[in-house]
Regions:
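Functional transmembrane alpha-helices
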Residues: 2, 124-135, 244-268, 273-279, ...
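Small-residue-rich helix-interface/hinge motifs
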Residues: 3-122, 422-444
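Internal alpha-helical transmembrane segments
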Residues: 10, 14, 21, 32-34, ...
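Primarily interfacial, aromatic-capped hydrophobic alpha-helices that serve as membrane anchors
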Residues: 62-68, 460-480
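Juxtamembrane extramembrane loops of integral membrane proteins
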Residues: 112-116, 132, 175-236, 262
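PDZ/PDZ-like peptide-tail recognition elements
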Residues: 142-174, 207-259, 316-318, 327-348
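Hydrophobic membrane-targeting alpha-helices
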Residues: 154-162, 420, 424, 468-475
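PDZ/PDZ-like domain segments forming the peptide/carboxylate-binding groove
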Residues: 159-203, 243-279, 283-286
Length: 483
């Protein structure tokens, strides 16, 4: 429960910050060009809200008018020339509020199709969005995306300035990598040290390493001190590598004990720091990764025969200590743990940045993250990629189990880039849809009709809702164990 609360709090903190600043981007340019903003809300306020500068949630719930908003009589003339007098709210400034539905936020700009379409047939006013020059309307619409993208670059820069960049150079991983069955069929061998591909050189063990492998035709490795070239015959995608279990590749870590956890099978069996595990149930253990694979197989056997769980969890372990081999028998924990941490044999490298240095470095890293994200979107259009789509549950699960400001800000920056990119897509109801119509107007000199714009907004909104439903449905199905 504690982990769930920590992840949830981090998720809402990040989303609130990103939504607030996104809407402030629209708000800033609207105010800069003299456009009225009727409402500015963090989260949606369907029927009622939590807080408002001139309204109360009780009045909103019971559809009562706000007390403090004055009205005035306005005479309107219809298409037949008939006049009528109506009561209209006077503009008393922007209503700032906090909604209750955390699916986003909004900035109600006067004179926009999707914000005040009930006023489109009325006489225009100089403070309305629709009467402003095209270039001003364009800046108002891209303001949110621009702020989100610049925010991501700034966060990356400050992360580099505060924590630097810590990584292990791939070519210094002296024990090499270990591969799953698919990797071994391609020609890789456990212990291979990755050098380069025809696409570039391996530098760090991160997502870019997998991208290089996925795009490569040839991979050069150091095997037993000799450079060896492997020609990939299998068209393995990045998605295949990420989803494979056991992993397509991982750093090879010796099965040597660094520390024994208290009150665990390892402590009860007398295992100590420095012991090297040689086998489990007679199966040779050459690395910590291979140990985890054998433990996973034990879990599979328990799933097939749950009644024999205690018997299956009883394992025989052979280990070496000071050149002497010995054997113990112990019972794994319910979550199939022995109870020790392995020695990590690699020394990380940390590159530190001054404040000025961090700015271009953060900008460069942000551009790289955006380019990688756009490139990875091609997998969404595959069957497996569509299944991998996730909603709020998936996003929340990406945050760390414990409070870690470093990882929190990295995740927030990534979400900011995703939010910026998704909003600039040319889909009506999103910022990109408005930008598309404005660019059309700038090129042709003709503005799309209001009727067309309204219909396009409805279609775009429907598409976005369907996409959100599917993404969150995937989360539910995964939670229920159907995916």
């Amino acid at each position: 429960m504690e982990i769930f609360l920590i992840k949830t709090l981090q998720f809402f903190m990040a989303i609130s910050l990103l939504v607030l600043l996104h809407e402030l981007g629209h708000f800033f340019f609207a105010k800069l060009f003299g456009v009225r903003v009727n409402r500015f809300y963090l989260f949606f306020n369907y029927r009622f809200h939590i807080a408002s500068t001139y309204d109360t949630w009780v009045r909103r719930l019971f559809h009562l008018k706000p007390e403090v908003v004055p009205t005035r009589e306005v005479t309107e003339t219809d298409d037949n020339g008939k006049t009528k007098t109506v009561q209209e709210k006077e503009y008393v400034g922007t209503e700032y509020g906090l909604g209750w539905l955390p699916l986003g936020g909004y900035c109600a700009i006067d004179g926009m199709i999707d914000e005040t379409n009930q006023k489109l047939s009325e006489e225009t006013h100089p403070w309305e969005f629709r009467v402003k020059p095209t270039w001003q309307r364009l800046l108002i619409m891209v303001g949110g995306v621009l702020v989100n993208f610049l925010l991501a670059l700034f966060i990356y820069a400050m992360v580099l300035y505060t924590w630097g960049e810590t990584y292990v150079p791939v070519q210094q991983m002296s024990y090499g990598m270990e591969f799953n069955e698919q990797g071994r069929q391609m020609g890789f061998r456990d212990g291979d040290i990755l050098l380069r591909t025809n696409e570039g050189e391996f530098k760090k063990f991160d997502a870019d390493l997998f991208r290089l492998l996925a795009d490569a035709n040839e991979v050069q490795v150091l095997r037993d001190g000799t450079a060896t070239t492997i020609t990939k015959s299998d068209d393995t995608s990045l998605l295949d590598m990420i989803k494979s279990d056991p992993p397509f590749l991982r750093p090879r870590i010796p099965a040597v004990i660094d520390s024994v956890l208290p009150a665990t099978p390892a402590e009860e069996a007398g295992l100590r720091k420095g012991d090297r595990l040689a086998s489990i149930n007679g199966v040779e253990i050459v690395s910590f990764g291979r140990l985890t694979e054998q433990l996973a197989k034990i879990g599979d056997r328990i799933s097939e025969m749950p009644a024999d769980s205690m018997k299956i969890r009883r394992v025989t372990i052979t280990y070496e200590r000071d050149g002497i081999t010995d054997t113990i028998t112990t019972t794994l924990t319910a979550d199939l743990k022995i109870g020790f941490s392995p020695v990590y044999p690699y020394t990380p490298t940390t590159e530190e940045y001054g404040f000025i240095e961090s700015l271009p470095a953060g900008a460069g890293y942000g551009w790289h993250v955006l380019a990688s994200y756009v490139d990875d979107l091609k997998y969404v259009f595959s069957a497996d990629g569509a299944k991998s789509l996730g909603g709020f549950g998936t996003i929340g699960s990406l945050f760390p189990d414990t409070w870690d400001w470093h990882r929190f800000w990295l995740m927030t920056a990534l979400l900011s880039i995703i939010l910026a990119f998704m909003n600039i897509l040319p889909i009506p109801a999103l910022d990109g849809g408005h930008v598309l119509f404005l660019l059309y107007e700038m090129v042709t000199g003709r503005k799309p009709s209001d009727q067309f714009m309204v219909r396009a907004e409805y279609i775009g909104f429907g598409f976005v809702v369907i996409l959100m439903v599917l993404a969150n449905l995937n989360d539910i199905l995964r939670w229920l164990g159907y995916m």
